[in-house]
UniProtKB/Swiss-Prot annotation:
Gene3D superfamilies: Bacterial phosphonate metabolism protein PhnH (3.40.50.11310). Belongs to an operon involved in hypophosphite oxidation. Exact function not known. This is Putative C-P lyase subunit protein HtxG. It comes from Stutzerimonas stutzeri. Pfam families: PhnH. GO terms for biological process: organic phosphonate metabolic process. Belongs to the PhnH family. InterPro entries: PhnH-like_sp, Phosphonate_metab_PhnH.
Amino acid sequence: MMNETGMAAAPAEAAWRIWQAPRQQTAFRQLMTAFSYPGRVVPLADGAESALLLVLTTLVDSACALADPLHALSSDDLRRLGVRSASVEAAEFVLADGNRLLEATPRLGSLENPEQGATVVMRVSRFGEGPHLRLTGPGIQHEQVLQVSGIDPGWWKQRSEWNAHFPLGVDLILVSGHEVAVLPRTTHINLKGAH
């Protein structure tokens, strides 16, 4: 990555870009692509950027509550985000690790306000490895296959229970390294034949 002098940007400078509006606007467009094409792996971050942190700097602000049961964010990052800390049950955004199930149910929204269901931002090991998830639903022409490793199989049962009464439910943003894939609550996951 080059800075305005044409020199390669230092890692600290590259990491700082995620706090700036132009980078967040680009990331927002990339995230909207991921939401529009469920299960498609989309490159989000580059260089020294953290895709997990870039998702948060792009989508959350001081009006949002964030649950970080992983303690994945530093106190400096939390301060810069300006979010309120909340429990998993009360937060609009929940950080999760694919290897550990949540011990509480995130917000599912209501019939009057289904958009108040939480967005779970989940760290996973890797895309392109692991079980084949066969996805169908809005934004998917016939079927999309997503391979992802580092997710406890119990997550799919939890997600199914949370999203059983559409339009209530949660949306998942899976994050691995510099890439993301989104599983909106409208996406159906078929694990049969997963290998």
